[in-house]
Amino acid sequence: MSDALVWQVIRNNSAFLRTQRGIGKRFSTEKFNLKKVNSPKYSGLANKHAIDVSAAAKGVVVSTKNEKGRPAKAVTTSTLSKTPVASVRRLAKNAGFNKFNKLAQRRAAAIVRSQVKKAKVQKTDA
C-alpha cells in the first residue's frame, strides 16, 4: 500500500490519536513519530522509512524502520550510551533520514539532558 493511502485510512481513525483541552492540534503517540503531531510528514505508520529516539536505562535507544519484505526484519534497534547525539547523527545519516536528522538529534540531546544526575547541595549549619 502506498504511504498516501495508509495516511488517508489512519488520519482520523487511529488508536494513537490524542487531544488536549484548549489546543486545536491533534497529537499522536505512535512509535516512529518524532514530533508526536498527527501529520503525514511525521507519521510513523504512514511512512515506509522512519526513525525513533527513546530513552533507555542509560543512554538512548534508536530504532529505524526500513522497507523490508518481512515485518520482523523491518525495524532495527540499537542502544547508544556514549555520545548519543553524535551517534544519532551518524545513524540518521547512514540510514538516509536526512529530513529528520536534526529533529532526532534534538530529541536525543533532550533525553541525555534529562538523564544527567544533578549534584545535591549540602546544607551547612552556620
UniProtKB/Swiss-Prot annotation:
Keywords annotated in UniProt: Acetylation, Ribonucleoprotein, Ribosomal protein
Modified sites of kind N-acetylserine: S2
One cellular component (GO) term of this entry: cytosolic large ribosomal subunit
Biological process, per Gene Ontology: translation
First and last residue of the signal peptide: none
Pfam families assigned to the protein according to its UniProt record, in alphabetical order: Ribosomal_L28e (PF01778)
Coiled coil: none
InterPro entries xrefs: Ribosomal_eL28, Ribosomal_eL28/Mak16
Keyword rRNA processing assigned: no
An example Gene Ontology molecular-function term: structural constituent of ribosome
Regions that span the bilayer: none
Similarity field: Belongs to the eukaryotic ribosomal protein eL28 family.
Name of the featured protein: Large ribosomal subunit protein eL28
Organism: Caenorhabditis elegans
